Amino acid sequence: MLKPLFWPNLAWLGLLAALPAGAQDLSFTLTIRDHRFDPQELSVPAGKKFKLVVKNLDATAEEFESHDLKREKVIPGNSEGTLILGPLKAGTYSFVGEFHEKTAKGSIIAK
């Protein structure tokens, strides 16, 4: 016969297994519209790994590029891309849309 504490523990493990991978991770979204990033400044917690979803609402592709973060990713028009960033030290990290650098620019501020 199984001990009474076995079933609650088994149920708890089942709930943990049902969570999607990375459900505990932080997630932030940048939107590209009219060749501009929104928001232009994104605040994130320093010292934490996070997911950055870049949604491109324009019909043309844009390249998210950051020399500070050592990341670049082409986001096709009307689609989205995901980058895993961090953990970052406190500071400001600039990024641009390489295909429209005059208008598509911003920064991630780790606090």
Regions found by a protein language model. Give the residues of each.
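Bacterial N-terminal signal peptides that target proteins for export
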Residues: M1-A11
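N-terminal signal peptide c-region/cleavage motif recognized by signal peptidases
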Residues: A18-P20
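N-terminal edge beta-strand
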Residues: Q24-G47
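Extracellular/periplasmic metallocenter environments
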Residues: Q24-T29, P76-K111
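Beta-strand-rich interaction surfaces with strong enrichment in secreted/lumenal proteins
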Residues: Q40-L42, K70-V74
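Short beta-strand/loop motifs in extracellular/secreted proteins, especially
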Residues: F50, T60-E62, A104-G106
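Asparagine-centered strand-capping/turn motif at beta-strand->loop junctions
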Residues: V54-N56
